[in-house]
């Protein structure tokens, strides 16, 4: 061997102290500058490289304090930030203490490079003390890594060694990383699959179980690249085949391959998908879902489950993004175009096309489910694309032509997902389409005024509400009805309509509590605004910024009560156009009536009070609900109606209270109480709660009345004068209700004195009676309530309120509130149906 040339490569020098261990004590051998150097010797037939750590004396640079070769199985330990300690091949313990941590970093990096390129058997380990000082943590920075054999011919021995190595390498992150790179680089999974097929053919169960455990161990490495490689086309069948064998169930085997090959989970194209990249992503997403939910469901821990879920979410996002630009969605939704559907009725439509439409509903539902995890803006973008491409045609087909209840439920779930995200999204997209069509018409016809007129007269599209209402009234499937009611609640919730319209209000320096511009009780809007903001009037710029949204929401609910509510609540509307047979069919449908009663409670509580109250009272809906409490109906329906009545009286609304008193709507409640007088059941508890509400509110009013009379002299004078002139005492809606039930149903209440709340009501009634002028009682019966609620004007008929009377309630409400707060010494003139008349009658 002939020497050719020698090259030396060195690192920067760093100041350091050198220590040697002698007699169990560290001896300082001097201070100098340390550097690492690699000596490359070129020989004729090969190249030899050697690495050294050299320390030269800081005062005498030519004097070498240390020259240590990096060789053999030396383990270098980095302790804390500035120490490197090791034992050389001769057994000497050496330590280098660097002046700065940067110097230690430089030499550690040198050791890492030497291990990777020159001396693979050396290692570098970081040693860190734990917080309590009672131990240390070791982390491998670099070092030799034992790896499984990649010989083509595997056997039981090599598989056992591989399993042991893979398990050992999970101890340190460095070992895991090196193992993953090795496995992917050398296609080790393909090697396992090949031997698996051989072992299965030759019936070698030990090898089959070993391969299964090896693959599961690699899954536990929790590395994304390995997980994704398992579901590639060339590997997926082999992987699920390996995972059919489980050492926990040695006598049985799963059938994952059969499931993938023969049943529905296989990739199915309703219409041809030409985008091969998208097709690959869809397949990979499904296979990962299959692994997570079926194959590995009993094996995955939380970390593995989280990783696979994250991968699936990323793939689903990719799918949704691709579908928005791919023609696949257009081709799919063309199956539901109205021309094709209605024309197909004239001929025998092929079974294949019907099946495609069924599968299309499932596919769109899957896409909607995928989109639930998208960001808000991405989700809105996708939903808008669906609506523009014809989603409503699909929904129309599902609800009007499809007979499979499961598919109808999926279509309803699709609606719910969209309206829960943005209740106005569908309407806004349809409005954009309408405006676009108007602009096109303008370009073609050149008639600008006509286009403007068309846009100005555009009305709110309530097609979705109409579809849902029809389903609720006509479909008997309980699961579908539940979803429809959920969708209706979302569509009809005022807060859902607000959306992001007020996001910019904070930019104006204002903090609106609960969006006071859209409160249900908005009669004193300026006062509420002044109380919360300190401003005397609502600033014009605030109204301008939200005016369009407010008008849109107001029109939305206005049209609901005109177009949809009469049909939706038809079974509860008195004197509607239904035949007796049709009405009886609805009334006998307990599930439907329960849903409708809950919806009535919802709109009374959540909607603008004026418009919802007008609709409810004008159509005698409360009378119908009260009638449902009578005997002859299912107990659950009777209790639902009772709950609705309780919710409405809790609104503390004058008009609701007077209507229910004057029409004796509490009579069925008392009958129900008599039925369950001494029973310990749900009905009795619900009825006790009814009395609790009245008793507690009467008590609260009493306290407030005392505070009003004695807290301020001015108020005391005005209140006394008002009471003297009106000949009445201060009252509340609940006080009136208490008087009504005590005057009307004393026998029933006397039987209920064992109930604390009923006893309180009787005591409050007696106390209230003593306070009446001259000690005279005045009963609140249906007859004398008629004196002030307008029934005598309505030809003396009780029951349903006339339209004119309800209009009176609404017209006078603002003036009434002003009058009630007035301190004018002149008594106000009482108007028909006004609160002033109501108080005076008592």
UniProtKB/Swiss-Prot annotation:
Per the entry, what this protein does is:
Core regulatory subunit of the histone H2A phosphatase complex, which dephosphorylates H2AS128ph (gamma-H2A) that has been displaced from sites of DNA lesions in the double-stranded DNA break repair process. Dephosphorylation is necessary for efficient recovery from the DNA damage checkpoint.
Give the UniProt keywords, A-Z. Nucleus
Coiled-coil annotation reads none
Cross-referenced InterPro entries, in alphabetical order? ARM-type_fold, EVH1_PP4R3, P4R3-like_central_dom, PH-like_dom_sf, PP4R3-like
Q: Which GO terms describe its biological process?
A: DNA damage response; meiotic recombination checkpoint signaling; negative regulation of DNA damage checkpoint; negative regulation of glucose mediated signaling pathway; positive regulation of double-strand break repair via nonhomologous end joining
Any single GO molecular-function term of the entry would be:
protein phosphatase activator activity
User: Where does it localize?
Assistant: Nucleus
**Self-association and partners:** Regulatory subunit 3 (R3) of the histone H2A phosphatase complex (HTP-C) consisting of PPH3, PSY2 and PSY4.
Record's GO cellular component terms: nucleoplasm; protein phosphatase 4 complex
Q: Which Pfam families match?
A: EVH1_PP4R3 (PF22972), PP4R3 (PF04802)
Q: Where does the UniProt entry say this protein principally localizes?
A: nucleus
Q: What is the protein name given in its UniProt record? A: Serine/threonine-protein phosphatase 4 regulatory subunit 3
């Amino acid at each position: 061997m002939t020497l050719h040339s020698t090259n030396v490569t060195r690192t920067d020098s760093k100041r350091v102290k050198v220590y040697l261990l002698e007699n169990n004590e560290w001896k300082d051998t001097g201070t100098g500058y340390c550097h690492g150097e690699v000596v490359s010797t070129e020989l004729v037939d090969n190249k030899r490289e050697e690495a050294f750590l050299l320390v030269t004396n800081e005062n005498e640079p030519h004097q070498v304090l240390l020259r240590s070769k990096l060789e053999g199985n030396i383990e270098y330990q980095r302790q804390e930030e500035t120490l490197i300690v090791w034992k050389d091949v001769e057994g000497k313990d050496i330590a280098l203490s660097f002046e700065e941590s940067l110097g230690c970093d430089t030499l550690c990096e040198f050791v890492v490079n030497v291990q990777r390129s020159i001396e693979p058997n050396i290692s570098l380990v970081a040693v860190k003390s734990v917080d309590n000082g009672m131990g240390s943590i070791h982390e491998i920075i670099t070092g030799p890594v034992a790896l499984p054999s990649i010989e083509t011919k595997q056997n039981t021995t090599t598989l056992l060694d591989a399993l042991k190595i893979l398990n050992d390498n999970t101890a340190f992150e460095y070992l895991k990383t090196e193992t993953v790179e090795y496995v992917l680089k050398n296609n080790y999974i393909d090697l396992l699959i090949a031997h698996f097929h051989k072992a299965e053919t030759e019936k070698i169960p030990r090898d089959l179980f070993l391969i299964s455990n090896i693959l599961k161990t690699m899954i536990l490495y929790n590395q994304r690249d390995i997980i994704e490689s398992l579901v590639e086309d060339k590997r997926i069948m082999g992987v699920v085949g390996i995972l059919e064998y489980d050492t926990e169930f040695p006598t049985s085997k799963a059938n994952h391959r059969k499931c993938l090959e023969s049943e529905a989970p296989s990739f199915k194209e309703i219409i041809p998908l030409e985008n091969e990249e998208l097709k690959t992503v869809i397949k990979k997403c499904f296979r990962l879902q299959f692994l997570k939910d079926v194959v590995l469901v009993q094996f995955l821990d939380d970390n593995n489950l989280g990783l696979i879920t994250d991968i699936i979410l990323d793939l689903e996002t990719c799918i949704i993004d691709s579908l928005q630009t791919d023609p696949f969605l257009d081709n799919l939704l063309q199956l539901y175009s109205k021309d094709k559907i209605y024309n197909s009725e004239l001929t025998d439509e092929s079974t294949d096309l019907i099946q495609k439409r069924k599968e299309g509903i499932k596919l769109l539902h899957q896409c909607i489910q995928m989109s639930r995890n998208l960001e808000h803006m991405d989700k809105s973008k996708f939903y808008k694309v669906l609506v523009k491409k014809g989603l409503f045609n699909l929904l129309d087909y599902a609800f009007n032509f499809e007979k499979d209840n499961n598919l109808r439920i999926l279509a309803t779930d699709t609606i719910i997902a969209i309206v829960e995200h943005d209740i106005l999204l569908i309407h806004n997209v349809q409005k954009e389409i309408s405006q676009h069509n108007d602009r096109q018409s303008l370009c073609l016809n050149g008639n600008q005024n006509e286009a403007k007129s068309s846009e100005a007269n555009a009305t709110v599209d309530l097609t979705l509400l109409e579809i849902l209402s029809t389903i609720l009234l006509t479909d008997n499937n309980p699961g579908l009805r539940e979803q429809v009611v959920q969708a209706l609640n979302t569509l009809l919730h005022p807060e859902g309509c607000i959306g992001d319209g007020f996001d910019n209000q904070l930019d104006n320096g204002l903090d609106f509590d609960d969006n006071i511009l859209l409160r249900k009780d908005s009669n004193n809007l300026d006062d509420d605004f002044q109380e919360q903001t300190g401003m005397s009037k609502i600033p014009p710029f605030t109204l301008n910024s939200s005016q369009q949204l407010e008008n849109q929401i107001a029109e939305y609910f206005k049209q609901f009560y005109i177009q949809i509510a009469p049909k939706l609540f038809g079974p509860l509307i008195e004197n509607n156009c239904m035949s007796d047979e049709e009405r009886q069919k609805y009334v006998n449908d307990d599930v439907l009536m329960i849903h409708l009663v809950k919806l009535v409670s919802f709109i009374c509580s959540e909607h603008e009070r004026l418009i919802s109250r007008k609709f409810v009272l004008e159509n005698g809906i409360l009378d119908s609900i009260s009638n449902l409490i009578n005997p002859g109906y299912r107990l659950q329906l009777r209790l639902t109606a009772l709950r609705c009545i309780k919710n409405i009286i809790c609104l503390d609304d004058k008009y609701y209270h007077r209507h229910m008193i004057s029409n004796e709507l509490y009579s069925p409640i008392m009958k129900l109480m008599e039925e369950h007088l001494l029973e310990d059941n749900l009905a009795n508890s619900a009825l006790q709660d009814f009395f609790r509400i009245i008793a507690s509110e009467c008590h609260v009013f009493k306290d407030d009345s005392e505070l009003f009379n004695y807290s301020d002299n001015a108020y005391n004078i005005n209140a006394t004068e008002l009471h003297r002139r009106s000949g009445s005492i201060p009252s509340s809606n609940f006080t009136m209700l208490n008087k009504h039930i005590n005057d009307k149903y004393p026998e029933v209440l006397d039987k209920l004195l064992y109930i604390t709340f009923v006893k309180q009501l009787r005591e409050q009634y007696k106390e209230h009676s003593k306070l009446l002028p001259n000690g005279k009682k005045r009963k609140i019966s249906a007859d004398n309530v008629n004196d002030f609620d307008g029934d005598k004007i309505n030809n003396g008929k009780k029951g349903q309120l006339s339209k004119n009377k309800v209009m009176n309630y609404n017209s006078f409400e603002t003036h009434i509130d002003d009058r009630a707060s007035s301190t004018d010494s002149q008594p106000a003139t009482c108007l028909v149906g006004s609160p002033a008349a109501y108080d005076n009658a008592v």
